[in-house]
Structures are given as structure tokens and as C-alpha cells.
Amino acid sequence: MSTIVIFLAALLACSLLAGWLIKVRSRRRQLPWTNAFADAQTRKLTPEERSAVENYLESLTQVLQVPGPTGASAAPISLALNAESNNVMMLTHAITRYGISTDDPNKWRYYLDSVEVHLPPFWEQYINDENTVELIHTDSLPLVISLNGHTLQEYMQETRSYALQPVPSTQASIRGEESEQIELLNIRKETHEEYALSRPRGLREALLIVASFLMFFFCLITPDVFVPWLAGGALLLLGAGLWGLFAPPAKSSLREIHCLRGTPRRWGLFGENDQEQINNISLGIIDLVYPAHWQPYIAQDLGQQTDIDIYLDRHVVRQGRYLSLHDEVKNFPLQHWLRSTIIAAGSLLVLFMLLFWIPLDMPLKFTLSWMKGAQTIEATSVKQLADAGVRVGDTLRISGTGMCNIRTSGTWSAKTNSPFLPFDCSQIIWNDARSLPLPESELVNKATALTEAVNRQLHPKPEDESRVSASLRSAIQKSGMVLLDDFGDIVLKTADLCSAKDDCVRLKNALVNLGNSKDWDALVKRANAGKLDGVNVLLRPVSAESLDNLVATSTAPFITHETARAAQSLNSPAPGGFLIVSDEGSDFVDQPWPSASLYDYPPQEQWNAFQKLAQMLMHTPFNAEGIVTKIFTDANGTQHIGLHPIPDRSGLWRYLSTTLLLLTMLGSAIYNGVQAWRRYQRHRTRMMEIQAYYESCLNPQLITPSESLIE
């Protein structure tokens, strides 16, 4: 429920944010020039200023209604005030003007960067290199209400007298009659190739793409509740990055280019360096700014009438027949090698994170099997499973009766601490062979007999038979002593168990002392000869306890060793059959866990506990289900089948997504790495190729007759 609430809240927040962005964008579309003066200060328009502006606009409308010298009325200009006109923008900027052929008394067009503004004509004389300007919004062009300290309030009378004066029509020029004429041929938008030169190199977009790769990686290791949000954010970042790299520029972002015709001239002193010479060329009063690599080729157009395309900031984009930034980008594309390097490095980073942080074996196997078309196999007998033809990637469901495998030292198991030790029920031996018998051990029987004989004599029960009278036994117990009424039996059982010379050394020494014998061999001979029959030994309680502990300590190694040996003897299944192994160590049997692990029992109890486990797990029902991850046959002919638990829907998508991300990162690293290297090599030679192209166009090499002959 909380997830749904969070989702709805996030959806509402995104909707509100999208609505606000649309509103801001629509407002900026209505005022597209606002972004050009983002650093301008603002204030409110005073009532006196508004009255002066209204009077000026009224007088301007009257002037525009007067027919020009050709008899035609001037084109109407909508300079009506609107709701945004109360905000005054104050900035310091250069003003550029162009002349046009028209009957309009105000024949000049004024620009602040790429934004055309309406400047009252009587203020032209106050234009400087840097101007303090105040603007207000109108329905069409921004209106200048103050220029370098001169305001409309002070010059309303001058405005009316100037606006009513007839102005002769001339050709378009920069300085009118005082300068050479410049013809404005056309005003166009820059081409995509010209825009590419001022477009960012795509580093920000490359970083967005790398960030989306990282978010896709984190989708694989985060809880399911966060995956949709991370995946959605990653898709948005990836889309934004790809859109920034490959989307065509918006029409509003294309700058205006003025196509002019005139005579460029160089104004400067002798002795100037190359950089100064390229920056002192003017077209009328327009100081042209050329690309640095054009410096050797612009001299031939000086003093001649030439077509020149420039931005409003006076940067030249085309001159004459051959010099063209558009043709440069078209014939010698820009090589953005750095963004390819960033994407390749980000792809390698995510690739290494996948290799070191996420197990890739199962996702790759599952994806390959899914692509090949895996089958589902169900089997209840060994023959049925053998005939099914199991392959890696198949879904396997089997049930039957088998034996839990015995874990041996040096073998790998996914389950590190099985409750059924030494049995491992995450590995099932399944075949048609007859079940193995329960393990038996003669040494364990001998150790048990010795332990029982000592316990019977040290801790007698009333119903036990004894070689001494009941009255004597009672008297001995009252005195606090302990009676061994069959000492010879203990000696014989010890000799039977501890046949080796180094076995039970401490126990043998204790029995030699109790029997007042020279050594162990002599004591055993006496016992075998029957000389110890009827010999009773009295022990103090401390000595009796010591003897009991010695017997327990001496028999423990035999029982422990025999338990391990019996377990290993079970690790020899019949040839053939199957060994079903769980990759995650899950038990395939439904048996109650023992109260304690086998090796947590005292040594004297381990054998009995082991026999109970063997009786339960050597022939036990099991159910195994999962996806086959590995199949191989060992030297014994047993087919090993590894099973991975069947993942849920979320797990399936994680497997597929892991493989897809791995392949995508590998492909991205290779492609962008190769592209970065190739683009870097081309970037190094691009400028030389452009200069060679201009050299061949402007200074063609003529082929001499001797060179054209075919030998």
C-alpha cells in the first residue's frame, strides 16, 4: 500500500513539475529574447515613464501612417504595451545597426547581439561602443526607453520634430552616405553544420549516459521496490544523453546570419603581426572577425566586391566562393573523440563492476538456455531421467528415493554446515542399485564391551549379578570404597581392544599397578591363565573415578576413528546413476533435523547417533526441482547434475537484465573505444586537411604537358 501511495505522490509531483516547465517554456517562447539578457537587472516602470512611452508610441503611429516618397505607406509596426511592459531591464551592451532600403523614416535596424530592438531615431548620435540601455517589453520588439542617460521624458518634443522630418531613401548601408554601401542580400538561419561548430562537444551528454549505465547496474543489486525508480531514472538519463548527442537543433537555437555584399578592406599599420592583421579587416564600419585558419586565404578578396555571411557578433562564416565553415564541417566532420572516450571508460567501469560484484555464471547460462528453448523434464525413476536427455538450461523436477551423499574432505559443497553431518542432503545419490547395509565395527563393539564392564563394576545396580555376597558388598559401600569384583575381565577386554603396544598406555599402566604385576604382558598372561579369576580390587572413590575417566579417554579415539571410517565406506556408491547437487546447498529431503550435530555428541555416543542417521538417510525420499546448470560424468559412470532453484519473475528479469547489461557494456566499450581512437587520429589531421583543401581550391596546381604523358 505504501508503495502505491509513494508512486501516486511521485506521479503528482512529476505532473506539477511538467506543467510548470511547460508554462515557463511557453512564456519564454512569447519572449524569446529574454534568455539573451539573463544577467540584466530589472526594476518597475514609473507612471511618468509609462506616460512618456505611450506618447512616443502614439506619435510613432502617426508618423508611420504618413506615405513615403514612393507613395507607399510604411509597414505597420506593432509596439503596443502589454502586461510585461511594467518590467524595465537594465544592461550594458554594444549596439549593432544595419541600413535597409525602405520608405520607413527610421531606416535603421538595431541589434543587441542577436535581438532586434526598437531605438528612437533621435538617439542614434548617442550610441557608443558600450551603451547603458533600458528596455521594456512590447508586443513585437523590445523598446529602448533610455540610452546612456537620455530618457523619453526629456526628449519627447525632440522626438516629434525628428519623426516628422522627411528622410530620403537610400540603399542599405552601415554609415549612409558617409561610408561605402553594403547590400543586405538576405537574413537566414545558420545551417546544422554551422551550428555544430558552436555546439557543445557532448561531454555533458556523455556523462549522463555513463550515469544511466551506473543506475542500470544498481538496479541489479538493489531491492525490488527501488528497481522501477532506478530503471525509470536511468532511461530518462539515457534518453536525455542520446537526445543531446543526436537530436537536430531546435529552430529557436539557430542564430541569424546576415548575408552581405560589399568590399572588405584592411585598416592597419605596417608591422602588425598575423593575428592583428586578420582582425583589422572591415566591411564598411563592421569589423569582421575571421576564423584563425583562414588567415592565409582572405587577402585575395580584399578590395573586391565579395559576398560575406556573418553572425550578429561579426564573426564570418562564409566569404567568397570557397571559404565556408559549412563546407568545412560537411567535408571534414568534427571529431568529438573525448565524449567517446568518456562513454568507453564508463562502460569499462560498469563492466568491471559486473565481473567482480555480480555472479555471472547463472545469468549467462539461463539466458543462453532461454534463447535456445529449454525444456521441462519430470522424472520419478532413474530410467526415466536417463532417457530424457537432460541439457544445461532445462528445468528439472524429479522425485524418488535415494541416499544423501557423504561429505569428504577436499570436496566442494555449497552447504558449509549441514545438520546431517557427515551426510550432505543437498547432494542426492540416485540409482537402481541395492541399498548399502548399515555400517558395523568390531572395534566399536570391543570398546563398548570394555566401557560396559567397567561401568557395571564401578556403578553396580542391585539387580546385577556379583561374585561377592550382598552383605560384603553392602559393607564395602558403607565404608566408602569401590569394589572391582571381576578385575580379570577388565584386563582381558582392555587387551582385546588395545592390542597394539602404543594403545591405551595410561590405562594399561593403571591396571598394572592395580594388579601388582611387573608389566602389562605379565598381567595379561596371568589373566589368560585364569590367575585373576576371583581377584577383587578395592578402590578409593578418587581412584575409581580416575579409572572411569581413563577408560572413557582410551576408548574415544577408537570410536571416533571407526565412525569416520564407516562414513567413508558409505562414500562408494554403485557405478552409474545420478548425483543431484544443489548449487545453493538446499536440502532435497524432508527429514527432521537431529537435536545436535554428530560431532557434538560425546565420542561414546557418536556411533549410535551415526547409525541412526545412516538408517534414516541411506534410503530416504527426496524431491529436487531447479534449472540444470552443469552436467558431467565422473570416472565411476555417475552423472552429476547441478540444479539452481527456479527463480521467480523478478529473478528471471534480473538474469536477463544482467546478461543484457553485460553484452551492452562490452559492445559499448569496444565501439566507443575504437571510435575514440579513430576520431582522435582524424582530429589531429583535420585542420591540415582543411588547409590542403583550401590550397587546392584557391591555388590549383597546373599539370605540365610532360607530367601528363603516359609512359
Swiss-Prot record:
Chief place of localization: membrane
GO annotation, biological process: cellular response to cell envelope stress; regulation of phosphorelay signal transduction system
One Gene Ontology molecular-function label: phosphorelay response regulator activity
Topological category with respect to the lipid bilayer: Multi-pass membrane protein
InterPro entries listed in its UniProt record: IgaA
Listed transmembrane segments: 2-22, 205-225, 226-246, 340-360, 656-676
Pfam name, any one: IgaA
Compartmental location: Cell inner membrane
Protein name per the record: Putative membrane protein IgaA homolog
Annotated source species: Escherichia coli (strain K12)
Gene name of the record: yrfF
